[in-house]
Amino acid sequence: MNYALLSNGITTALEKEGSIEWFPVPKFDSPSVFTKILDEDKGGYFLITPEKFNKVKQQYVEYSLILRTEFDDGNLILIDFLPLSLPAIIRLYEAKVPFNVEVKPLFNYGLVNAGTETRKDGIIYKNPESKEGLELLINGDYKIISPYRITVNSGKGYLYLLYSRDLRYGLFSQKGFVYSEPYEAYSKLLYYSRKELERARKPSIYENAFYRSLSVILGLIYKPSGGIIASPTTSIPEIVGDERNWDYRYVWVRDSSYAIEALVKANLLTHARRALDFLTNLLDPSSKSFDHPFYSVDGTPPPAEENLDWLSGFMNSKPVRIGNAAYLQIQMDIEGAYMNALYEYYKRTLDKDYISSIFWAVEAISDWVSSSWRGESTDIWEERGISRHYTHTKLMSWVALDRASKLAKDLGYNKLFEEWKSRANEIKIDILNNGVKDNHHFVRYYGGDEIDAALLTLPIYDFIPATDTLFMNTLKKIDEELRVADGLYLRYKKDFMGLAKNPFTLVTTWMARVYIRLKEFDRARWLLETLIKCNQDLGLIGEHVDPETCEARGNYPHLFPHSGMVLSILEFDEVR
């Protein structure tokens, strides 16, 4: 799956070899108008290719999310990007040969055919069921064969496709002059991308993987709110032909907290602060701190899950789902994820004024965790219909109170410090008494025999030293039972849908971070290099990977492994 990600912090697109096959508008979690990635025949696409070609080379411009596609050693060169602040696609071209353009938008995930209107300078594609539409402005020596096919002669020019909720304010309206000139938009985006990454810490190893992962994290931040989505796609299957197809275009408290840690460690503190503020504003002091595991990009509750039965699915993997029913789950680990991210931000900035201003959130979470940690819940892996006393969930309750106690101590709240520290110790004792099998190794849930990869986070969150015998035994079992290829691991053996098959890429970065703590640096580097080799040509990592082909599986690219890559690389620098 060698798709390139294009993003401007408003929406995203996925492109492969000149064909844009995913484009939700106007924002990350909106219905798509190009959906070919989920249905070869009915999905819709925006294709630019020469009449004939033998080879295609794709690469990003520097560490931006601007894509350069070259056909046959320069016969046709495309520069594709989403301009800042607009739900639009700009495609600059330089051609030595004539080429073809095919534009086939279908509104509402391929369900609604577009009405068309040909203009002197381009084409309008209207949604007959609303005021929205797309407008294609064409620059160069071209001929419109039909509303869906254009031929362009050699030379330089561009194609500018803009989405409008109301076509009265689009490119061809009297207000069209306000939209960016394409070449200027390119320069602005490249300058902006450079400036963002210039602020980041410079790593001593794996520079390409580091900056590409950072650019992906930044590309998944919804700029109007600061929320960070887990992935730009829906229903890319974990296993081809299976039903493990989910919509990840939402802001998971857990995933975004992990990304905040990566941003903090990378010194991109403004983005980290905005993402923290987004999560803080979702807190409910009167109930469970986060009443949903994830939210829409504007902070509203996510939509209910539904199947799009008219789409055949990625490689015929049905169903295609939008929305996500996991939003109804009670997940008791997420408060700890947030608290750890907040604490990491504080450690980096020592900004007591900021922590004081949101200490109500620290208290609300600590009170809720203190009164609720003994209950059962769904775990980090979001198994449907199953609640247990998961060891990782208890760990994150410990993390919440441990970090809260440290913040309270630094702010001079000594009584709260003692109270929360005592409760954290109580949880720790409970885990050591109930989350361990035969005094030998940790288990996935109390009273069970299974292990899972989330147990790798025990030393990462400083619950227990990586050298502790209990953990070393656990590490050995994970390596023996969950490893399916060199450096690649399942997150668990089975779930409510059956046996797991494809490795979960985040686990490789967890493993690397564990071996860094064990000072086995060669092993840690080998693990990261294994994942880097599977990163596709463009350096993007999916949620899963096929252990035989190294091809990405699951939603793509995914926030978790890119955050883990950044954290792993920077932790190398801290111990060297």
UniProtKB/Swiss-Prot annotation:
Annotated thermal dependence: Optimum temperature is 70 degrees Celsius.
Enzyme class name: hydrolase
Chain coiled-coil ranges: none
Any one GO MF annotation of this record: alpha,alpha-trehalase activity
Domain of life according to the entry: Archaea
Keyword check for S-adenosyl-L-methionine: no
EC number: 3.2.1.28
Signal sequence annotation: none
Keyword terms of this UniProt record: Carbohydrate metabolism, Glycosidase, Hydrolase
Matching InterPro entries: 6-hairpin_glycosidase_sf, 6hp_glycosidase-like_sf, GH15-like, GH15_Enzymes, Trehalase-like_N, Trehalase_2
Biophysicochemical property: pH dependence: Optimum pH is 3.7. More than half of the maximal activity is observed over a range between pH 3.5 and 4.5.
Biochemical pathway: Glycan degradation; trehalose degradation; D-glucose from alpha,alpha-trehalose: step 1/1
GO biological process: trehalose catabolic process
Reactions mediated catalytically: alpha,alpha-trehalose + H2O = alpha-D-glucose + beta-D-glucose
Cited function: Catalyzes the hydrolysis of alpha,alpha-trehalose into two molecules of D-glucose.
Family recorded in the similarity comment: Belongs to the glycosyl hydrolase 15 family.
Protein name: Trehalase 2
Organism: Sulfolobus acidocaldarius (strain ATCC 33909 / DSM 639 / JCM 8929 / NBRC 15157 / NCIMB 11770)
Lineage of producing organism: Archaea, Thermoproteota, Thermoprotei, Sulfolobales, Sulfolobaceae
